[in-house]
Amino acid sequence: EVVIEHGALLRIPGILQNYDSHRPFIIADKNTYSVAGKQICSLLDKKGIEYSSFVFPQEDLEPDEFSVGQVVMNFDSNCDFVIGVGTGTINDISKMVAKVAGLKYMIVGTAPSMDGFASSTSSMILNKVKISLPSACPVAIVADIDILCNAPKKLLQAGFGDLLAKYISICEWRISNLITGEYYCEEVA
């Protein structure tokens, strides 16, 4: 389920109901909590939906084993759903937590800074090495246009760059196929 519209946060209680969730666990950082997390918590309070949350206290968040551990150490085992509030790093951490917990997962995007919202992998740092790990694929992606439009300029630029890189990487893949015989799949490209 993908919801991209003005006021999209208002749809979150209905999405939770569609997936029979009665107590979500919300993951955010200080910035994404102030941009959208606080509104989500207020909305859930008004609807009488119980939830638990963890807001990362640090400024420079990395998608590593320490960050996943912080969430796990604060995770409420009574929760039946995971809501990530943020973009790249929060998305990757939340997907990993949802996979480990065996729960459904929703991402609430706060900036169009990357294109991995629907991915079933997480870009993680393990022992200081960047790797891709299988993770939970979101059952819902929620993007409030008003929030996305007010994202910092550098995050808007990052998203544009991410989109451009996809086209360039496909061209490089084709060239590699022609020159070296590298496997190429038209369907994936």
Predicted ranges, named:
Residues E1-F81, Q157-A165, C171:
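ATP/NTP phosphate-donor binding region
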Residues L9, I90-D92, S113, S120:
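Short, electropositive, low-hydrophobicity segments enriched in small/polar residues
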Residues I27-A28, G86, A143:
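Short beta-strand/turn micro-motifs composed of small residues
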Residues V35-A36, D92, A151:
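Residues that form or flank phosphate/diphosphate-binding pockets in enzymes
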Residues P63-S67, I93-M96, F117-S119:
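Short, conserved acidic/polar surface loops in the N-terminal third of protein domains
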Residues F75-A111:
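A short, small-residue-rich loop immediately preceding and capping a beta-strand
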Residues A101-A189:
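A glycine/threonine-rich phosphate-anchoring loop and its flanking beta-alpha core
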